[in-house]
Amino acid sequence: MTQHSPYSSAMAEQRHQEWLRFVELLRQSYDKDLHLPLLQLMLTPDEREALGTRVRIIEELLRGEMSQRELKNELGAGIATITRGSNSLKSAPVELRQWLEQILLGAQR
């Protein structure tokens, strides 16, 4: 009997479709001004806090004034979380990075 890995291509595709479904649900919730209640329903307080921390990590990485170790101490995040953020930012599309710089750093320039 073949056991299916939770990371099989069929499972990965299903998870991707579920993610896209959530993203579309979130998009639609903005049209009805229900995005905050939806996110409060879908995310635990810890998950919401983690997302806020990740935004700060990306913001500080874009600013480029602190080392990853300084970020770890400043934000109380694990070095692995900061490294993942850094790696994700490096592989992000140029348009996304430019948009993030404009949104997160624009008021400070």
Swiss-Prot record:
Keywords on record: Cytoplasm, DNA-binding, Repressor, Transcription, Transcription regulation
Annotated DNA-binding residue span(s): 68-91
Recorded superkingdom: Bacteria
GO BP of this protein: negative regulation of DNA-templated transcription
InterPro entries reported in the protein's UniProt record: Trp_repress, Trp_repress_bac, Trp_repressor/repl_initiator, TrpR-like_sf
Subcellular location: Cytoplasm
GO molecular function: DNA-binding transcription factor activity; sequence-specific DNA binding
Gene Ontology CC, one term: cytoplasm
Subunit structure: Homodimer.
Function: This protein is an aporepressor. When complexed with L-tryptophan it binds the operator region of the trp operon (5'-ACTAGT-'3') and prevents the initiation of transcription. The complex also regulates trp repressor biosynthesis by binding to its regulatory region.
Annotated NCBIfam families: TrpR
Family: Belongs to the TrpR family.
Protein name per the record: Trp operon repressor
Organism: Enterobacter cloacae
